[in-house]
Amino acid sequence: MSAPRTALSSARQLSNGLIRRTNPRKRFLPLPSTVRSFTNNKPLRSQATAAQEPIVESERPSPVTSVNQPLSFPCLDALDTKTQSLTKQKKSLSGPEPSYAAGETEHFHSASPILLDWGGVLPEFDIAYETWGTLNADKSNAILLHTGLSASSHAKSTAKNPKPGWWEKFIGPGAPLDTDKYHIICTNVLGGCYGSTGPSSIDPLAENNTSSAQKDRYATRFPILTMQDMVRAQFRLLDWMGIDALYASVGSSMGGMQSLAACVLEPSRVGKVVSVSGCARSHPYSIAMRHTQRQVLMNDPAWSSTRGNYYPSIPPHAGMKLAREIATVTYRSGPEWEQRFGRRRADPSKPPALCPDFLIETYLDHAGEKWCLEYDANSLLYVSKAMDLFDLGDEHMRTLDGVRKSNAWKLDGFAAGTAKEEEKAGLCNLTLPDTPYEEQDETSSELLASSPEEAKRARETSSAALIAEEPPEDLVKGLQALSGTPALVMGVASDILFPAWQQREIAAALRKAGNRRVTHVELGEDRSLFGHDTFLLDLEGVGGEIRRFLG
């Protein structure tokens, strides 16, 4: 005889409850139960009796409503408010686009075209720069300071621009970059938005509209560029300044890439190299993080609906904010945030929210908010892509050299003013692969055995090889140009964007290339928990090593 339905149901509930309590980490699906349709089943006797009894009005159940109130989303409201504000500015003709100027700078204008590595040509370009210290008579004390991705040329305050710079304490009398000894030059990179030619600049070859305020900007007509292209533009500036050779090429983060590239391109013009938290080739994790930022940005409707030509309308501030939040995660370290924020909430007295709630969330939200209109979105796309393309390995450098040679003829047309439209239209072509990469079922050992070439490449990039400081032969060949240049290579153990093995790789490759004057310093977590941003914050650790190395 079957058990009564109610008893069976209660037993199931009790059983499920006991299982959940005794196995708190394991999830169980509820036991199957019979589904009963109240419209088709006959009412039970008790139900029929109850149906005949009159219902007192006061006992009548009220209409069913949710007891849960919908959440509010002040973070999204803030984005809407910002968009509305920018729209009003556009309608009032007060200028919808933010000002990307970083204060008063010097400007160098090159009227000669520049050929870029991937076939693009800029018919002319500007470089914004600032200087500190005095250039001596024979112009032998110049140091070229290379910036990070989003930095301007304003590394230190000047009489024209008293606002503190991004390396304020690192530059000055007696500082690591001692202005009593050296003449420091810092530029905004080609492709940037702080005075140098970039996607937000006016395209001199485009047909201008009648209104001077609506002249055609490059936008995504701006050609793909590389770290080496940025360095070539900087050396064009040095030529104009009459500086034949640098005392040193110094840079951190993206600037650490450029400081190496400068010596690879012009080994006879660089006396010393300082690369802090940089790399000689971008690795997949950093490429993936920057790709994610670009995808978030390009999927902002303000960008995607205009395909990057948002300058006459609303800038993609929401995408920029989110991209910056992602970037900020890679700039700092987990241990620092554990100490600084932990799991604390901004206001424990309030219920949890889906908008920023934990202190770490409010920190990221603020980082994105304060930056979203400070930098041009297209500059972020182009400059970050240049970082991804960076590889000083011999094979890649030979490939770029071949591409440059095959496009050298374009300079003649641009110089003569006879460049054809179809030539200009093909300066930048991005194609997707026919078949996307798919996960393989094979094991690591099977993958290593798939081909000798893949096995060799895997061995060279394996953790064991990195720990043993065995750099790839391709990179050793690529860095041969630095074999006679004194080099300081610094890394930070807590850095996840440019992990410390990349700086060990640079130092090992330089030594294997024959360089006997390589100084490698790695700041452990006992000295810095600031991750990649250590180069901006650690005056004693980073600055002290630079001071000692420069002499």
Curated annotation (Swiss-Prot):
Record's compositionally biased regions (Polar residues): 7-16, 34-50
Active site per database record: S253 (nucleophile), D495, H532
A GO term, aspect molecular function: serine O-acetyltransferase activity
Keywords in alphabetical order: Acyltransferase, Transferase
InterPro entries (alphabetical): AB_hydrolase_1, AB_hydrolase_fold, HAT_MetX-like
Gene3D superfamilies named in the record: alpha/beta hydrolase
GO cellular component, one term: mitochondrion
Name of the top EC class for this enzyme: transferase
Region span, Disordered: 1-69, 434-464
UniProt record, GO biological process: cysteine biosynthetic process from serine; homoserine metabolic process; methionine biosynthetic process; terpenoid biosynthetic process
Residue stretches making up the AB hydrolase-1 domain: 141-406
Pathway: Secondary metabolite biosynthesis; terpenoid biosynthesis
EC number: 2.3.1.-
Residues binding substrate: R324, D533
Site, Important for acyl-CoA specificity: residue positions: R290
Region feature (Important for substrate specificity): 148-151
Assigned protein family: Belongs to the AB hydrolase superfamily. MetX family.
Cited NCBIfam families: homoserO_Ac_trn, PRK00175.1
Function: Acetyltransferase; part of the gene cluster that mediates the biosynthesis of enfumafungin, a glycosylated fernene-type triterpenoid with potent antifungal activity, mediated by its interaction with beta-1,3-glucan synthase and the fungal cell wall. The pathway begins with the terpene cyclase-glycosyl transferase fusion protein that most likely uses 2,3-oxidosqualene as substrate and catalyzes glycosylation immediately after cyclization.
Protein name stated in the entry: Acetyltransferase efuC
